[in-house]
Amino acid sequence: MTKITNDLFLKAARKEQVDRIPVWYMRQAGRSQPEYRKLKEKYSLFEITHQPEICAYVTKLPVDQYGVDAAILYKDIMTPLPGMGVDVEIKSGIGPVIHNPIRTFQDVEKLAIFKPEIEVPYVLDTIKLLADDMLDVPLIGFAGAPFTLASYMIEGGPSKNYHQTKSFMYREPEVWAILMEKLGRMTANYLIAQINAGASAVQLFDSWVGALSRADYAKYIRPVIEMIVSEVKAAHPTTPIIMQAVGASHLLAEWETMPLDVVGVDWRETITSAREKVPTKAIQGNLDPSTLLAPAKCLEEAERILQEGVLEPGYIFNLGHGVFPEVPPEMLKKLTNYIHERSEILLKKG
């Protein structure tokens, strides 16, 4: 395995002292990069992820080009679902489309048991390739969390309000619990397999869970998240686990009492306020990705965020959501350099 010579991200995830703030970006691999766009002229997303050499190349690009302190595996949260019998297609300009949406108990019952080594060996091979030969920074594996996956599976695709998902949850609580258990078991096994293959940390993306109230989260979602995190920690006690959601500041207190290591926040929450709500966790975030299209505002906001971030150990600079395709790659490089150079000065000042 290649030796990790830059462990800033891992130190920050453990709330240890660092000499500069680590940086990485959600959706840093692909999307805005010309090299990636050229590949997409020839291959679909799933075709890229099925070819370990190409997928590893895409994953490593932002490390080489932007100088980020961690790589995140290039794939989609939908990647494991075909292994459960879900007919999913990634449509350009739309996103994931499910051709056999969940509507009944029978639909849930038909979902197959997911075995990562059998269903997604190409994902594990990509991780091994990166960890063994290509990276000197930590590699982050990830999975979609059960609510977000269920929202696609029930709605049949992206949604603005998640009415069908929430009404299914309220109307069929027993069936919902079975669906959560199946997705939770898949997610735990998937994350453990990624760590076994060489991932240094894992992130749970619960992109749409902010649509739920805290009471509904505690009743319908928290049990499965606790199960996932507990199983991953039982298998890999020292591997950092990150929870990332959007518009979910009202759920921070729920995550404080789980064995998570890092909590990602978006631009609706300040770093200082987040620390008050999750004092035992490292914080990741929280630049609004829209500012990347307004360079002066971007650096102004980055400075404000940094001023809060450096006050205590356990801070990782990131966005509050993913990089847009329109973002110029040179802006990400400029921002990375700014965070590194400016944070080093601020940390020296103490």
UniProtKB/Swiss-Prot annotation:
Catalytic activity, reaction form: uroporphyrinogen III + 4 H(+) = coproporphyrinogen III + 4 CO2
This protein's GO CC annotations: cytosol
Subcellular location per the Swiss-Prot or TrEMBL entry: Cytoplasm
Short name of one Pfam family: URO-D
UniProt: substrate binding residues: 27-31, 46, 76, 152, 207, 321
PROSITE patterns, sorted: UROD_1, UROD_2
Enzyme Commission identifier(s): 4.1.1.37
CDD domains linked: URO-D
Domain of life: Bacteria
GO biological process, one term: protoporphyrinogen IX biosynthetic process
Pathway annotation from the record: Porphyrin-containing compound metabolism; protoporphyrin-IX biosynthesis; coproporphyrinogen-III from 5-aminolevulinate: step 4/4
Chief localisation class: cytoplasm
Annotated keywords: Cytoplasm, Decarboxylase, Lyase, Porphyrin biosynthesis
Residues carrying the site annotation Transition state stabilizer: 76
GO molecular function, one term: uroporphyrinogen decarboxylase activity
Subunit comment: Homodimer.
PANTHER family in the record: METHYLTETRAHYDROFOLATE:HOMOCYSTEINE METHYLTRANSFERASE RELATED, UROPORPHYRINOGEN DECARBOXYLASE
Function: Catalyzes the decarboxylation of four acetate groups of uroporphyrinogen-III to yield coproporphyrinogen-III.
Family affiliation: Belongs to the uroporphyrinogen decarboxylase family.
Name by which UniProt lists this protein: Uroporphyrinogen decarboxylase
High-level lineage: Bacteria, Bacillati, Bacillota, Bacilli, Bacillales
